[in-house]
């Protein structure tokens, strides 16, 4: 299966060793931006690693990529669990284990500046009718986002702006444009 996996480290307390952050340059209609990203993967065992990494690196923009698995199989709640964990941790100001002293200090008031929610595999789930709505800026009306409404309302209450968009990473459709538009929030 082509999902992200990380090796464990440590003798007594096993912790996942995260990949190094990488710099990428994205371009869209004359705009350029360098982003520093780290692909942590969506497995439930990596959720606390997300939070630790966000706080340690003082991440300003959180990009969450979901797909349409929950539309195909209603029992698959991986995407909802991941976003729910992130929103609840930000709302409760949860401090994950393994933070440095500086990270614990930063965690007291940490909140990202924005969240970008990208629905991947648009080539599989987006119909021509919803493509027209996407062009008009109403992509959030698609049923793929219905299961995330509660978390999006919570983020709104926490004053964290959210940009919702559709992408197809397989074909490179709207990936860089969606990120650039998300950074403009």
Say what each PLM segment does.
Residues 1-32, 45-47:
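Switch I (effector-binding) loop of TRAFAC-class P-loop GTPase G-domains
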Residues 13, 37-38, 69:
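P-loop NTP-binding cores centered on the Walker
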Residues 54-56, 61, 65-158:
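Conserved C-terminal guanine-recognition region of P-loop GTPase G domains, centered on the G4
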Residues 41-43, 70, 122-124, 171-172:
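Conserved beta-strand elements of beta-rich interaction domains across eukaryotes
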Residues 7-8, 26-30, 43, 53-59, ...:
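Conserved catalytic network of the ASCE P-loop NTPase/AAA+ motor domain
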Residues 168-185:
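Conserved GTPase G-domain signal focused on the G5
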Residues 113, 159-168:
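Extended charged low-complexity segments that act as oligomerization/scaffolding linkers
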Residues 32-42, 166:
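Active-site-proximal beta-strand elements of phosphoester/diester hydrolases
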